[in-house]
Amino acid sequence: LLKFIGLKISILKNKNTIEIKNIDKNISTLAPYKLVKTMRAGVLVLGPLLAKSKKAKISLPGGCAIGTRPVNLHLFALKKLGAKIKIKNGYIFAEAKNGLKGASITFPSISVGATENALLAAFYAKGKTLLRNCAIEPEVKDLIKFLNVLGGKIKILGRKILINGCNKIKQNIKHEVIFDRIELGTYIIAAALVGKKIKFNKIDPKVIKNEIDVLRKMGVKFKIQKSTIEVFKSSKIKKISLSTKPYPGFPTDLQAQLMVLMTKAQGISRIRENIFEN
């Protein structure tokens, strides 16, 4: 998708690194269905394309087909920043002839994707933007860290995010992306299921503290150090009841894995799904 838009991308496999060059030249404002249909995250090009090019045509996203998952909160935030938007034939048409301008935006409900799209758009907008009722997932915080490395002035205040529009982007910057906490949680639950001693390195245990607390209540044993988590064989898995919630609550993306572990427990365990309606 990024290559189609016009970015020059090199994948340095030996360094596990992606290098992006010439990000301001020959940028397309179209993100077609054939690319965006495969992944929900494709809609995240809408905010920055609109902010930089003053227009964008983005296919409605596909992929990750859980729940109805509308993009109404994404569009709600962009309209507050000054965009004119219409949806036709499966595409989002967005325009801001005079550019995006900072605004005060309160999300009706918490959304990771909408928070990220608003962040990316506000980063390029003129003036200050205040986002309220934001998602504060580690991935959102990592995006903010990256944007600040690029030259942004973004602060997190609880569930509020204050963004000062960036006039000049720094070049030749480096950023190390945060580890995938859902992958980590999946492997930890797998370790608990098979009853093997497994050690996970180069991670931040604080990021998945809630998940570890839940698993400890179920009888899973851990040894936790600054950047490692060690899972030990558990003699008995205990029943538990919990609800999925936005971060820092238990993530919906781990409830299916946890359900498998629950089959090992004595008694009846329960999960209430609060993020997706189906």
Describe each model-derived feature in a short phrase:
Residues L1-N278:
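Short, structured segments at the rim of ligand-binding sites
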